[in-house]
Amino acid sequence: MKADPNKEKALAAVLSQIEKQFGKGSIMKLGEDRTMDVETISTGSLSLDVALGAGGLPMGRIVEIYGPESSGKTTLTLEVIAAAQREGKTCAFIDAEHALDPIYAKKLGVDIDNLLCSQPDTGEQALEICDALTRSGAVDVIVVDSVAALTPKAEIEGEIGDSHMGLAARMMSQAMRKLAGNLKQSNTLLIFINQIRMKIGVMFGNPETTTGGNALKFYASVRLDIRRTGAIKDGDEVVGNETRVKVVKNKIAAPFKQAEFQILYGQGINRTGELVDLGVAHKLVEKAGAWYSYKGDKIGQGRANAGRYLTENPAIAQEIDTLLREMLLNSNAPKESAADVDDNVDPETGEVF
């Protein structure tokens, strides 16, 4: 059926008016691959960068990463910090859980000598530190670990068992209103790690929710749901996790994509394994039987050996990475480059129904 030209003209006019009033990218077609022209930082996972649509996490925005315990939330943020530091950016880690392991961070490539770290006593103190760092304009990436550990001062000073209904949610709501504008002006990326809780009495739908009230869900430009889907074994020994990340909210590109990758204990995201898998999928790396080859040269028998070869030859790994990014982040990239999420999702908050 042919579209009404008057309606098309009216739609184009109102879309132009909305973008002029609220900013480019405030409205787009769901299937569009066009992304907002924003600076991004890689997540350390090529498949996740592709799922995000813009090549990484956006600067000047709020990002929420949530999931169950030991799913890889902190590992993912440390990978982002390492990537930012390699670009010469200044990073800060607000360790409200008092659980940051500097040895592990160093193994992931974080320059711990130049990483700003704070272990605040109260939630208000943590958020004030975030605001001060943001307003300085000198810090590029701030990670808060975690929202659940941001305890209001009144709760800390009170007795165990006292009721403090809504205090944390009110604190987060006030902080979001204050931080959002400052982050945009200073072009600072603020990442909140969050935990999952269960709603009581939910009979139908997803009973899971995140801590800290609803404000963060609405102010976040990107929300990532990270889950451990399986174990990676070397013989009988478990050496890592199979991980799936769902982009449940995305204001800079089409949302509802997902990425799968491996997190190896003590090493972080298995980048070379991703390069081998994506290289084969997009015909940059040839596979014949168990042998993998690149540009006619054999690089290993079996996925593990091919990945090891790329680790030992970073120039070749970087070449494959660059070619894949050009292919997958291009506007003409194939649709299957990032899988769609099947769940019914609230388009405003990214919550699953």
Swiss-Prot record:
Disulphide-bridged cysteine pairs: none
One Pfam assignment: RecA_C
Location in the cell: Cytoplasm
Predominant location category: cytoplasm
Residues reported in the UniProt entry to bind ATP: G67, P68, E69, S70, S71, G72, K73, T74
Compositional bias segments (type: Acidic residues): 339-353
CDD domains for the chain: RecA
InterPro entries, A to Z: AAA+_ATPase, DNA_recomb/repair_RecA, DNA_recomb/repair_RecA_CS, P-loop_NTPase, RecA-like_C, RecA-like_N, RecA_ATP-bd, RecA_C_sf
Matches recorded under Gene3D superfamilies: P-loop containing nucleotide triphosphate hydrolases
A molecular function (GO) term: ATP hydrolysis activity
Gene Ontology annotations of biological process type: DNA recombination; DNA repair; SOS response
Stretches the record annotates as Disordered: 334-353
NCBIfam families: tigrfam_recA
Function: Can catalyze the hydrolysis of ATP in the presence of single-stranded DNA, the ATP-dependent uptake of single-stranded DNA by duplex DNA, and the ATP-dependent hybridization of homologous single-stranded DNAs. It interacts with LexA causing its activation and leading to its autocatalytic cleavage.
Similarity annotation: Belongs to the RecA family.
Protein name: Protein RecA
Organism, scientific name: Shewanella denitrificans (strain OS217 / ATCC BAA-1090 / DSM 15013)
